[in-house]
Amino acid sequence: MKRNLLFILLLCVSLHHPKAQTGNNNYVKTTVPTVATTATSGLSVSNSITSYQYFDDLGRPWQTVQVGMNPSQLDLVTYQEYDAAGRSSAFWLPVNAASGNNGNPLSLSTVQSRSQLSSNYGDGKAYSKPVYEASPLDRVLEQYGPGQEWHNNGKRVKTEYLSNTADGELSCRWYRTTDTRGNVQVSIQSGKVYYPAGELYVTRTTDEEGTGISLEFKDKQGHLLLTRRKNGVIYHDTYYVYDSYGNLRAVLPPLAVDALAAAGTWTVATDGTGVLAQYAYLYKYDDRNRCIWKKLPGADWIRYEYDRGDRMIASQDGEQAAKSPALCTFYLYDIDNRPVIQGTCEFRGSIASLGSTAMLTSLKRSYDGKIIASGLENSGYNPNMTLYFPVVHTINYYDDYGFRSLTGFDNESYFPKESHLAGGLLTGTVTTLLDGSGKKLYTAYYYDEKGRPEKTVSSNHLGGYDITTTVYTFTGKPKTVTHVHTAMGKTQQTQVYTLSLIHI
């Protein structure tokens, strides 16, 4: 038995202090060429990015070495310590290794001495470190930031795990919510103003100075019920109220909480102080738990409708409802559930009737694939329901460039033919300016053979075009980005951005 214990202790010591030779450590080497190549043997730091990730005998990552990564082409080393229980302990900020390191791991003492150099941090405690509670839960009680000023002076973020009480700092009001004739009702029952003691989980966090205190209260289902911020002796509370299905029904910020402190029942209509209307966030749901009404502070209700496919098909805010005739915003989709048209139309009766079917559109094409100018504003899209006096705001096209036959895209000097397939990608948009002019802006998106954005051509409100062209490196990073801007009667402006690593 003693031999077994001795063996285990020796094993723990060996795992806690990994050896400093690459050949004696488990590692994964990753090399990413930055130029086209058929082999990695001849690559250097000038044309590749190489890193080593080292693992201890338990398979835990304890060090990462990025070869030649800093501007002086020195290795950049990140070190992770573990405590005796195998938990993450000190996590060191990256340090520069000495010249000629060649991807080898550093010992802890070397990392510490390198951190003290002025070329790194000039600090022997350049690491963050958690302090765990003495329990199998391994919860973090304290968190130190990098730097000896934090560690030597006990400056850390402190976390306490508590339960609520019936009064005092750890108390939580018991708000309830119901729907009454379409109104969201918030109430506190007489005799049940606060949650009973021990019903809620409370997490108290104190900042490094010991003055910034915040508390979070959660129920047994994990719902956040209260966030409490303490400013001196004053508490600022924000309450979150849920229904029996777990849907968020109300958010009460501090000014609303201060006014709704005693037992009572409130709705937007009956709240004589106007607190709910002015400060609260309120939500209503249908029998499928979809948000159908939303109220933001100081604003009127916003209404949402969905089709049988759970897609939002219409919305109406307070300003639209107040117009004569009333308006609503509609949303149309294609057969692949992609948004294709958004706009406004007259609101007649109930927009709920729109949800009785799936809001789809069909796209009319000629035999050669070109889109036929028909449907909503000659976009080619034909919805499967009646929209009264629709005004289209945005139109989206996907998969191909059949829309180039439509008005606005027929200038081949700026809108060239496609050069690669674009299946599943956004290829064109039409946007209507909302300044009352009715003018439209046209945009086409072009992609390379790998599906990366290669060229974007957009008409602008100045009677010209904006063209953005991107050239990629071998690794898929932007190498050059060229932006050309033209306007009617103005000189063409060209901007070229060149992006590169410092020494690659």
Predicted regions and their residues:
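Bacterial Sec-dependent N-terminal signal peptides
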Residues: 1-23
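Beta-strand elements of repeat-based all-beta scaffolds
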Residues: 5, 20-501
